Amino acid sequence: MKLVFLGTSAAQPTTRRGLSCTCLKVEGEILMFDAGEGMQVPYLRSKLGWNKKMRIFITHLHGDHCLGLLGLLQTMSMQRRTESVEIYGPPGTDEFVAANARMLGFSPSFPVIMETTEEGTVVDAPGYEVSACRAEHSVEAFSYRFSEKGGPGRFSTEKARGLGVPEGELWGTLQGGSAVSVGGRTVLPSDVLGEGKRGRTVGFSGDTRPTDKLAEFFQGCDYLVFDSTFADEMVKRARETGHSTAAEAAALAKNAGVKNLILTHFSARYSDTDDLLREAQKIHPSSYAASDLLEVEV
């Protein structure tokens, strides 16, 4: 599993940073969080592929988070994509996509499935879930949390044989999480499996103020990608615009027991992110600054 940062700038691009877009590669599938203008070039450079299974999650309808959608859909059509694309976003996302497609006279070569984001579980896939929580921004906005479903613990052949379970199909049944019957006795998966494997979790804040609700939502995340628009000296501006400082992001991550914090969405006023990172690391040492084309193994 890998995080790929395609755009890490806030509101407007810089010569070194594009607009908001982060992808999570999950076993051949692309989960994209926001699609800011200009995200196609870094997408190409990251070699993520045009025809893989894809779900797109829009946090809110500000241009720096969604204006790349139509261009992305058009390019995938020109690449003769046939696999459907699912797009999740706040109310109005479907209208935004449909209106732009209509004005451009564009009809995609593949099904585009639009879903309106609400709090709670957004996607329940075989290997993972994506859930949403309301963020605190200047427009209706959502944060997302990816949760990998845990796997079964290690299968003990010694215990299975000791319980009289013959090798073969019944072993597979137990490993799959179902009980079996042997000689009139029921053998449970817990009788032969070790402690289950914990799934990995990744949070994506989008644009937001740090709130207690989000701290609870992101509790225990392995990685948290969080709005870090401003340095601490501009906390007043952060409050006025519905954003966070790097220090505020770090405080939330610390309170939520987040293992690794990744700062992103930096104001264009900052030519580099060193000062913001230092402010965050004073509070949460396992803090890192994202940069365009950065890839992080999860």
Swiss-Prot record:
Q: What is catalysed by this protein?
A: Endonucleolytic cleavage of RNA, removing extra 3' nucleotides from tRNA precursor, generating 3' termini of tRNAs. A 3'-hydroxy group is left at the tRNA terminus and a 5'-phosphoryl group is left at the trailer molecule
Which InterPro entries does the record associate with it? Metallo-B-lactamas, RibonucZ/Hydroxyglut_hydro, RNase_Z/BN
Q: Does the keyword Electron transport apply?
A: no
- SUPFAM superfamilies documented for this protein: Metallo-hydrolase/oxidoreductase
| Amino acids binding Zn(2+) 1 | H60, H62, H137, D207
EC number(s) for this protein? 3.1.26.11
Q: What UniProt keywords apply to this chain's record, in alphabetical order?
A: Endonuclease, Hydrolase, Metal-binding, Nuclease, tRNA processing, Zinc
HAMAP family, alphabetically? RNase_Z_BN
Put simply, this protein is called Ribonuclease Z
Q: Which organism is it from?
A: Cenarchaeum symbiosum (strain A)
Q: Which gene encodes it?
A: rnz
